[in-house]
């Protein structure tokens, strides 16, 4: 087994960078590894149109480390009030690459999200016409639905209907967490893809709940039972081009996670590709990592793959116990624990 792994530079097709004073920290972490990233728009207020996307993009570019060529790929936040004209303008601007459907109340800063998918059908028609992909947080939010069943029920009630109604619309089922989602994506047309996070490949709900509640494993969609984790590992390592890397790295300050009502999100960007390598190594599938991390996403979005490369070496190191987050701190995934792979710096 090789102790060195070289890949075309990967991209992250789902990340939260937040805004303001924390951007120099979050942008540096993603730019260390990834050439591009799909930037989630759930700020306060959200990124609703091309002008707001451009302003956020400029703040991200200004926060890049010196010499970085990292490219943020911007996303619009869909609301009940989004207009088809805003979709056409976003597509025409060249730097908006998708629009995001958050069911209202599904996750962090989603209160402005869509209350009924039927309300945005004219917007989805415009997206299909101009070729702007739809990114979906696939969970229902009704109070009578068990949190572990939100994704499965969303598929049955909404996802099937959307892809059948708009067959030419490219749809990314984001951060999938269940065997049902894997099966849905496999059976859908080539216009449907899915991102998978490192934490859903490496962990299941036992890691979060057995022996005490571990808030830094709490995310949405929530970690599921190990049978779903196995289905995700099967999909990610299968070579199926419909599945690609999306960290859903979502930082919250330490005090906001370690609280009586803690926030949802895992911060993995600081060592994302190293964590994915561990997951793929568990399946003896390191030969499939480049396709998942570097090729499948660009192909789905109609973009060229990166031409430079990164190299990982099999070398144990200890993850930091905390990281700077503006004037505060964030506790990263795997804080204080050993990682088995290390990224060689400045290999391009």
UniProtKB/Swiss-Prot annotation:
Its EC number is 3.5.2.3. One of its GO terms (molecular function) is zinc ion binding. Keywords: Hydrolase, Metal-binding, Pyrimidine biosynthesis, Zinc. Zn(2+) 2 binds at residues 100, 137, 175. The active site is at 248. It comes from the Bacteria. Zn(2+) 1 binds at residues 14, 16, 100, 248. It holds the Pfam family Amidohydro_1. Pathway: Pyrimidine metabolism; UMP biosynthesis via de novo pathway; (S)-dihydroorotate from bicarbonate: step 3/3. One of its GO terms (biological process) is 'de novo' UMP biosynthetic process. Disulfide bonds: none annotated. It catalyses: (S)-dihydroorotate + H2O = N-carbamoyl-L-aspartate + H(+). Signal peptide: none annotated. Substrate binds at residues 16-18, 42, 137, 220, 252, 264. Belongs to the metallo-dependent hydrolases superfamily. DHOase family. Class II DHOase subfamily. Catalyzes the reversible cyclization of carbamoyl aspartate to dihydroorotate. HAMAP family: PyrC_classII. This is Dihydroorotase.
């Amino acid at each position: 087994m090789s102790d060195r792994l070289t890949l075309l530079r990967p991209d992250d097709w789902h990340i939260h960078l937040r805004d303001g004073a924390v951007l120099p920290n979050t942008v540096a972490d993603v730019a260390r590894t990834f050439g591009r990233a799909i930037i989630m728009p759930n700020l306060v207020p959200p990124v609703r149109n091309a002008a707001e996307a451009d302003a956020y993009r400029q703040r991200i570019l200004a926060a890049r480390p010196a010499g970085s060529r990292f490219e943020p790929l911007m996303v619009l936040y869909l609301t009940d009030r989004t207009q088809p004209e805003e979709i056409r303008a976003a597509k025409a601007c060249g730097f908006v690459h998708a629009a995001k459907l958050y069911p209202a109340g599904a996750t962090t800063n989603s209160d402005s999200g869509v209350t009924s998918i039927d309300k945005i059908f004219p917007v989805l028609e415009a997206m299909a016409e101009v070729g702007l992909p739809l990114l979906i947080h696939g969970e229902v939010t009704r109070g009578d639905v068990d949190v572990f069943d939100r994704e499965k029920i969303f598929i049955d009630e909404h996802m099937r209907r959307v892809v059948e109604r708009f067959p030419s619309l490219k749809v990314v089922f984001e951060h999938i967490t269940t065997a049902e989602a894997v099966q849905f994506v496999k059976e859908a047309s080539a216009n449907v893809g899915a991102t998978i996070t490192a934490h859903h490949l490496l962990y299941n709900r036992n890691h979060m709940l057995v022996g005490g509640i571990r808030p830094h494993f709490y995310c949405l969609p929530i970690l599921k039972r190990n049978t779903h984790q196995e289905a995700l590992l099967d999909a990610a390592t299968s070579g199926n081009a419909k599945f690609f890397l999306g960290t859903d790295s979502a930082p919250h300050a330490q005090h906001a996670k370690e609280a009586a009502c803690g926030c949802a999100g895992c911060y993995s960007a600081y060592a994302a590709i190293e964590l994915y390598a561990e997951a793929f190594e568990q399946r003896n599938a390191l030969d499939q990592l480049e396709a998942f991390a570097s090729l499948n996403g660009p192909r789905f979005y109609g973009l060229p793959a990166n031409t430079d490369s990164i190299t990982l070496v099999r070398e144990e190191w200890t993850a930091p116990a905390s990281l700077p987050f503006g004037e505060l701190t964030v506790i990263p995934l795997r804080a204080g624990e050993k990682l088995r792979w290390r990224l060689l710096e400045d290999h391009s």
